């Protein structure tokens, strides 16, 4: 909000008619997505959650094409999504992937994925006549406040360590990264079809594995044959959706 206010040279405050848009985005992009995600993550494996989360790209394109009718669902988009999903499955090949379905685990991760997909489509619709930075900033502020209240009512508490400065700095750093990422994401959705942008979400698990190799010393796991195959599949999916999915 502060950055947007500086860029616009005026306070970035939503108008009364824009409040429902902020509330709708806050509900889907922050409250429901993270509420279902963290509860689900606590009740399922990281492998399964990665695969289900990867389906958000496919869900995004389906909702954009079939529900909101913002673009056409072409065979190239379907092929690209299938390749991207295959890449996520390959990079997460593990026995735990085949374990039983859990409603509060796998089910909640799936609901989180649907909430995220709906929020992406809403950003596309709302950004036609509303500032994207304003939407991102205020929906995060509202959603964060609601999530804080829910956490406190559910028995959570705020406890600071003996040296709180590193923890506070890390919290602000993560908040800054999230705000920047979602603001850029919103701008991209404003000027491009949902499918062309959403398909890059397939890179999330691949980047996670590669960054783990560079930053956490997990090179042996990251540079497996499965990781390289996944990178090829995901890259092919992105290329097909962007180069063949729409006539320029």
Language model segments and positions:
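Transmembrane alpha-helices of multi-pass small-molecule transport proteins
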Residues: 1-32, 55-63, 115-119, 136-155, ...
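Specific transmembrane alpha-helical segments of multi-pass solute transporters/efflux pumps
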Residues: 5-53, 86-90, 174-192
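Juxtamembrane helix-entry segments on the extracytoplasmic side of multipass membrane proteins
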Residues: 14-20, 93-115, 152-172, 221-231
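Cytoplasmic-side transmembrane-helix entry/capping segments in multi-pass membrane proteins
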Residues: 17-24, 72-85, 106, 130-139
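Glycine-/small-residue-enriched transmembrane alpha-helix faces in small-molecule transporters
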Residues: 27, 38-39, 99-128, 133, ...
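Helix-helix packing/entry segments at the starts of transmembrane helices
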Residues: 30, 34, 49-55, 123-145, ...
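Loop-to-transmembrane alpha-helix entry segments
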Residues: 50-53, 69-90, 99-105, 217-237
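C-terminal-most transmembrane helix of multi-pass membrane proteins
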Residues: 167, 202-248
């Amino acid at each position: 909000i502060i950055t947007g206010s500086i860029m616009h040279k005026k306070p970035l405050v939503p108008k009364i008619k824009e409040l429902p848009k902020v509330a709708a985005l806050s509900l889907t992009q922050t409250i429901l997505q993270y509420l279902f995600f963290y509860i689900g993550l606590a009740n399922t494996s990281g492998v399964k959650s990665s695969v289900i989360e990867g389906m958000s790209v496919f869900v995004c394109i389906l909702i954009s094409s079939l529900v909101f009718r913002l673009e056409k669902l072409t065979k190239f988009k379907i092929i690209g999504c299938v390749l991207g999903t295959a890449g996520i499955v390959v990079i997460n090949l593990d026995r735990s992937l085949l374990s039983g379905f859990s409603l509060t685990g796998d089910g909640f991760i799936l609901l989180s994925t649907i909430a995220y997909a709906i929020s992406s489509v809403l950003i596309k619709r709302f950004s036609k006549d509303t500032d994207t930075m304003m939407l991102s900033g205020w929906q995060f502020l509202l959603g964060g406040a609601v999530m804080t209240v829910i956490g406190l009512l559910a028995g959570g508490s705020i406890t600071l360590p003996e040296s709180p400065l590193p923890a506070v700095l890390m919290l602000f750093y993560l908040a800054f990264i999230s705000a920047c990422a979602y603001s850029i994401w919103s701008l991209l959705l404003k000027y491009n079809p949902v499918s062309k942008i959403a398909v890059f979400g397939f890179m999330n698990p691949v980047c996670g594995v590669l960054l783990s190799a560079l930053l956490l010393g997990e090179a042996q796991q990251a540079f497996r044959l499965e990781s390289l195959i996944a990178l090829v599949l995901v890259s092919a999916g992105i290329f097909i959706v962007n180069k063949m999915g729409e006539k320029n």
